[in-house]
Design a protein with these regions (language model features):
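Broad hydrophobic/π-residue packing in well-ordered secondary structure
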Residues: 10, 34, 43, 97-101
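Extreme N-terminal tail/first-helix region
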Residues: 1-23
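A generic local structural motif
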Residues: 3-5, 30-32, 52
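Short beta-strand segments
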Residues: 15-49, 57, 63-67, 76-81
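Short, structured beta-strand-loop surface elements
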Residues: 52, 56-104
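Short charge-dense sequence patches
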Residues: 4-9, 44-50
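Generic detection of intrinsically disordered/low-complexity segments and helix-coil linkers/edges
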Residues: 1, 38-39, 97
């Protein structure tokens, strides 16, 4: 499986993932986020200034995520990724919001 195929699986087949970050005391914190898009540079998701999740990402710059899809352990697929996070601004915002409307 190529990296782009892996990203496609996470985005399109799994979509909702559990993300781990650390807080200001370096204690682990998890939340569920939806992966909205992907390309050869990485995965894309939405958050906003003022949210604790956004603050943790800005403060530490790394996350770990895991997602699973399937009916049970023997009939499922899972994926785990860790890495650096960067803010991309508003350049992809319209596309991401359009994709989000499919899930709302």
């Amino acid at each position: 499986m190529t990296v782009i195929e892996f990203f496609r699986t996470v985005c399109e087949d799994i979509h909702s993932t559990v993300v781990a970050t650390v807080d200001k005391n370096n204690l682990p914190v998890t939340c569920v986020i939806d992966i909205m898009d992907y390309d050869s540079d990485g995965l894309y998701f939405l958050t906003a200034r003022g949210k604790n999740f956004y603050d943790r990402l800005k403060a530490h710059g790394y996350l770990s995520l895991t997602g699973m899809k399937g009916s049970d352990t023997m009939h499922s697929v899972s994926a785990s990724i860790f890495g650096y996070v960067r803010e991309i601004g508003t350049e992809r915002l319209k596309t991401l919001l359009q994709k989000k409307s499919v899930y709302v």
